[in-house]
Curated annotation (Swiss-Prot):
Superkingdom classification of source: Bacteria
The protein's name in its UniProt record: Ribosomal RNA small subunit methyltransferase A
Function per UniProt: Specifically dimethylates two adjacent adenosines (A1518 and A1519) in the loop of a conserved hairpin near the 3'-end of 16S rRNA in the 30S particle. May play a critical role in biogenesis of 30S subunits.
A GO CC term attached to the entry: cytosol
Subcellular localization, as worded in the UniProt entry: Cytoplasm
E.C. no: 2.1.1.182
Organism annotation: Synechococcus sp. (strain CC9311)
């Protein structure tokens, strides 16, 4: 490698993943096959890049913000026929491979302070879908965020984020990543997760998505209160009871007990009422 003298920069949130087993698990989770085109976010010093290039994937397109690292990556991998590199902010630069061809899988060891915005760009939001759906994303994120993304109804970590993400794709745990797996070690625990985004036809419609967002904002504002209280602005008690029965839930439940699909059903009933009113 040609990164001698380069130290991790705090302003970029840099922590190099150095644990070989975790690096291998990330590549395994991506299930790379012949023809796959991979977008690697934050290649850093290239430890994961090297493994991706050795996989069956057809192309690896890396996006790196740190100019010094870009120079090292170019020097190390530029001669590899499967490698291409884009310098810039992953939140704003084009993410397509050369020739405008989109990647179909994403592998990312991202600065934790851009996790939310990056997920918005790669997967979209309920109320703002993306035009293109990746087949799989393997992401190294802060453990606390991972817990919220994949938490199931009834768990203390189940939140509005859980509902949103699980309506956008299938979210699963890959492996824990303790601080000692990085150089320098971060102050928080980390986790590798896998997200398989749903195609557009499996996602809630735009109208339903707006309804779900409206309900989530009301309900999780006071997550410990029962739905009969948090959803009171929706309408009368009788209306709420009717909508809840149609959605298969109880107004005695708390927001964290309601499954993502039930929020969609509740939004559908509410939209029907609004269209008649």
């Amino acid at each position: 490698m040609t990164f001698s003298g380069h130290t991790a920069r705090k302003r970029f949130g840099q922590h190099w993943l150095i644990n070989e087993r975790v690096l291998d698990r990330i590549v395994e989770a991506a299930e790379l096959q012949d023809g796959d085109r991979v977008l690697e976010v934050g290649p850093g010093r290239g430890a994961l890049t090297e493994r991706l290039l050795a996989s069956a994937a057809a192309a690896i397109h890396a996006v790196e913000l740190d100019r010094d690292l870009v120079a090292g990556l170019q020097q190390t991998f530029a001669s590899h026929p499967k490698f291409s590199l884009q310098e810039g902010d992953v939140l704003s630069v084009p993410l397509e491979l050369s020739g405008g061809v989109p990647a179909n899988k994403v592998v990312a060891n991202i600065p934790y302070n851009i996790t939310g915005p990056l997920l918005d760009r790669l997967i979209g939001r309920l109320d703002r879908p993306v035009d293109f759906s990746y087949q799989r994303l393997v992401l190294l994120v802060q453990h606390e965020v991972a817990q919220r993304i994949r938490a199931r109804p009834g768990h203390s970590n189940f939140s509005a984020l859980s509902v949103r993400m699980q309506l956008l794709g299938r979210c699963s745990h890959v492996c824990p990543v303790p601080p000692r797996c990085f150089q320098p070690p971060p102050k928080v625990q980390s986790e590798v997760i896998c997200i398989d985004p749903f195609p557009p036809e499996r996602r809630p419609t735009a109208a339903l998505s707006r309804g779900v967002e409206r309900l989530l904002k009301m309900a999780f504002l006071s997550r410990r209160k029962m739905l009969r209280n948090t959803l009171a602005p929706v309408g009368s008690t009788d209306l709420l009871q009717s909508l809840a029965e149609e959605a298969g839930i109880s107004l005695q439940q708390r927001p964290q007990d309601v499954a993502p699909e039930a929020w969609v059903a509740l939004a559908k009933g509410l939209n029907q009422v609004d269209s008649v009113a």
